[in-house]
Curated annotation (Swiss-Prot):
Cofactor binding annotation: Binds 1 lipoyl cofactor covalently.
Lipoyl-binding domain ranges (all copies): 24-106
Record family assignment: Belongs to the GcvH family.
NCBIfam families named in the record: gcvH, PRK01202.1
GO biological process: glycine decarboxylation via glycine cleavage system
A Pfam family: GCV_H
Name of the protein in question: Glycine cleavage system H protein
Disulfide pairings: none
Membrane-spanning ranges: none
Cofactor: (R)-lipoate
Length: 128
C-alpha cells in the first residue's frame, strides 16, 4: 500500500514528520505509522512550555495494537498542542499532515534536522 509523503516535510526514522516554517516546527506522525498502529485510541502529548530535546520521548500514542513512544525530532519549546486530535485521536488517520499535526515547537538553536529524510528517502525506507 502506498501512502502520501508531502515533499515539504522532513521525516524521522521514528516516523515523526516536521514542517519547518522559520523558527517554528510543526510535528506529527506519518500516514505509514498511523496505518501500522491501527485504530488509535489515546495520544499523550507534552504541555505547552515544556522543553524538548531531540531524540527524547515527548509523549506516546496508543492504539488497539500497541503503545508507541513519540520522539522529539528537534530541540525547542512547545508552543501549542493540537487539542482537537488529543480529544479525538481516531481523527488522526483522516488527515495526518494538515489537521492531524500534534505539536508546534519553537526551535531553539539551529534547526538540527540533519538526521531527517526527504519524502522520497522515507518512502523508500518504509515501503521498500
Amino acid at each position: 500500500m502506498s501512502f502520501e509523503y508531502p515533499d515539504n516535510l522532513k521525516y524521522m526514522d521514528s516516523h515523526e514528520y516536521v514542517r519547518l516554517e522559520g523558527d517554528v516546527a510543526t510535528v506529527g506522525i506519518t500516514a505509514f505509522a498511523i496505518d501500522q498502529l491501527g485504530d488509535i485510541v489515546f495520544i499523550e502529548l507534552p504541555e505547552v512550555g515544556d522543553e524538548l530535546s531531540q531524540g527524547e520521548t515527548m509523549g506516546n500514542i496508543e492504539s488497539v495494537k500497541a503503545v508507541e513512544d513519540i520522539y522529539a525530532p528537534i530541540n525547542g519549546t512547545v508552543l501549542e498542542c493540537n487539542t482537537a486530535i488529543a480529544d479525538a485521536p481516531e481523527q488522526l488517520a483522516e488527515d495526518p499532515y494538515n489537521n492531524g499535526w500534534l505539536l508546534k515547537i519553537k526551535v531553539s538553536g539551529p534547526a538540527a534536522l540533519d538526521k531527517a529524510m526527504s519524502a522520497s528517502d522515507y518512502q523508500a525506507k518504509v515501503e521498500g
